């Protein structure tokens, strides 16, 4: 984060997948109104974060394929991102669908394996996913419809209604 530490310090031991996750998490945290980001936005955020002297060649392919839960693994099998539309990604959340071959795959960096100053992102992610699940439940159209037809059955029990419909059937 550029905000997390000195730009003079180049960190070389962070995995490419973790670097992609960090950049995407930062985008989500900085732009809470955005549901997803373009591949280019994530690449640019990786560049801006400058965890390495140069952009590593694997960053793009991790964003496009290796980290994407709902794509077939080829060969990377992380579940760190979700493809929301062509060319669009967001962080993976528990409950998102994923390719069966990615079962059990890594979804977040281990806090001990990311650069100092970024550990708070893992805690932020835990809160973000919890809130996202709550929002999904609160905004689910089927769950919102619960009880909406109650007034239709105030005069007649459902079993009586079915019996009445079946009258005259042979």
Model-derived segments and their meaning:
Residues 23-27, 38-52:
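DNA-recognition alpha helix
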Residues 41, 77-80, 151-153:
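Generic secretory/membrane-interface signal
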Residues 35:
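Flexible coil/turn residues that form the inter-helical turn or adjacent wing/linker of helix-turn-helix
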Residues 26-31, 49, 148-152:
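Alpha-helix C-capping/helix-to-loop hinge sites
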Residues 152-163:
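Short linear motifs in low-complexity, proline-biased tails and propeptides
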Residues 2-30, 53, 57-144, 162-164:
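Phospho-regulated, low-complexity intrinsically disordered regions of nuclear gene-regulatory
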Residues 167-170:
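Short hydrophobic/aromatic patches at helix-to-coil boundaries
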């Amino acid at each position: 984060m550029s905000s997390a530490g000195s730009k003079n310090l180049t960190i070389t031991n962070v995995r490419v997948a973790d670097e992609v996750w960090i950049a995407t998490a930062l985008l989500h945290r900085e732009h809470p109104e955005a549901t997803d980001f373009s591949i280019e936005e994530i690449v640019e955020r990786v560049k801006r974060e400058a965890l390495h002297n140069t952009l590593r060649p694997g960053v793009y392919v991790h964003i496009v394929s290796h980290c994407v839960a709902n794509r077939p693994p080829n060969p990377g099998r992380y579940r760190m991102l979700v493809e929301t539309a062509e060319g669009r990604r967001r962080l993976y959340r528990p409950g998102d669908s994923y390719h069966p071959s990615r079962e059990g795959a890594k979804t977040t960096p281990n806090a001990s394996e990311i650069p100092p100053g970024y550990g708070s992102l893992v805690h932020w992610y835990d809160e973000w996913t919890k809130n996202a699940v709550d929002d999904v439940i609160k905004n689910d159209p089927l769950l919102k419809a619960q009880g909406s037809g109650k007034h239709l059955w105030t005069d007649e029990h459902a079993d009586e209604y079915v019996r009445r419909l079946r009258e005259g059937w042979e």
